[in-house]
Amino acid sequence: YDLQVKLALAQDRLFGSEQVSGIAGRMEAIAAVNGAFFAATGRPLGLLMIDGELISEPYASRTALGLGPKLAVMERVGFRGEVTLDDGSRLTTLQGLNRPRLQDELILYTRQYGTTTNTNAFGLEAVVLDGEVVRIEQGNSTIPPGGFVLSAHGVQRERLGQLAVGDRLDVTV
């Protein structure tokens, strides 16, 4: 037998709900279990990584389970992210990933979040594609396929405001 353990999102999106039997059928699974906590919106509460892509950040110092081909690990994990300019200098740090932006935060939005950031106009957003800032907007930016959006408020807005269209940057989490 060639059995694998796979993770899946309800309806293949961050905000979704679906019966476990539906996910199992879509994934052609022989067994399935709901192994996550999630909000009423369907958003996972806690660390979620699928096929090497970070989908959501850790939540409230909860323990996370990591499964590899020959190893399973349970640990408390934290979140750390940085925005680095092309010259190697650090612009700022991230406060979160694929969740609503709060006061004085910088949040990274990927397509796993949806097609737009769904943020208000009190922030500043840099739309990034292939490592290059392609647009600067106030809020509710379209998240490009293969790219991401950095969304800032308050103090972080000032830092993100240093960017211009054409600037190159890298984000690490």
Regions found by a protein language model. Give the residues of each.
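Gly/Ser/Thr/Pro-rich low-complexity, intrinsically disordered segments
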Residues: 1-173
